[in-house]
């Protein structure tokens, strides 16, 4: 009887420690969880605008992936490691009057950047030769695979 109570108490501690860590939600089939978001890599090749529209149709509040930290960048790099191409992310140039600023398409602030040295900002892709960690600009009309991200 004492072992049963000890085992039950242990399971309760494990359950309580997992709640609130992201383990209390489930992403749709074929999507992967990281933090409080769900991610999915798509091998279809689309323009940046087509990929963004596709992501918005796939998930509630979905967008091309925004990358907020080196840890998230590493997660996304692993997610797309089997794809042999540039990968669209949700960062692009926005011109406001004479100013040029880069913004994530989901409205989040750009707090982490990893542009390849010397690159100007247009639409951004993850570069395969960098293990999908460096960002390179490319024409927004070119067709590439992409990663969608949505809140869990």
From Swiss-Prot:
Disulfide bonds join 27-38, 55-148, 123-140. Residues 1-23 form the signal peptide. The keyword Secreted applies. InterPro entries: C-type_lectin-like (IPR001304), C-type_lectin-like/link_sf (IPR016186), C-type_lectin/snaclec_domain (IPR050111), CTDL_fold (IPR016187). It is found in: Secreted. Its main location: secreted. Expressed by the venom gland. One of its GO terms (cellular component) is extracellular region. SMART domains: CLECT. Heterodimer; disulfide-linked. Belongs to the snaclec family. Shows greater sequence similarity to the alpha than beta subunits compared to other heterodimer snaclecs. Interferes with one step of hemostasis (modulation of platelet aggregation, or coagulation cascade, for example). This is Snaclec 5. It comes from Bitis arietans (African puff adder).
């Amino acid at each position: 009887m004492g072992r049963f109570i000890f085992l039950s108490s242990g399971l309760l501690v494990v359950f309580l420690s997992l709640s609130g860590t992201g383990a209390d939600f489930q992403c749709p089939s074929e999507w992967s969880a990281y933090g409080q978001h769900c991610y999915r890599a798509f091998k279809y090749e689309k323009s940046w605008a087509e990929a963004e529209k596709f992501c918005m149709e796939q998930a509630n509040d979905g967008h091309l992936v925004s990358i907020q930290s080196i840890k998230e960048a590493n997660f996304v790099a692993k997610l797309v490691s089997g794809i042999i191409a540039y990968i669209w992310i949700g960062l692009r140039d926005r011109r406001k009057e004479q100013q040029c600023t880069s913004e994530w398409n989901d409205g989040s602030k750009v707090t982490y950047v990893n542009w390849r040295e010397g690159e100007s900002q247009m639409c951004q892709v993850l570069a395969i030769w960098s293990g999908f960690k460096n960002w390179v600009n490319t024409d927004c009309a070119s067709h590439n695979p992409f990663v969608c991200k949505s809140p869990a």
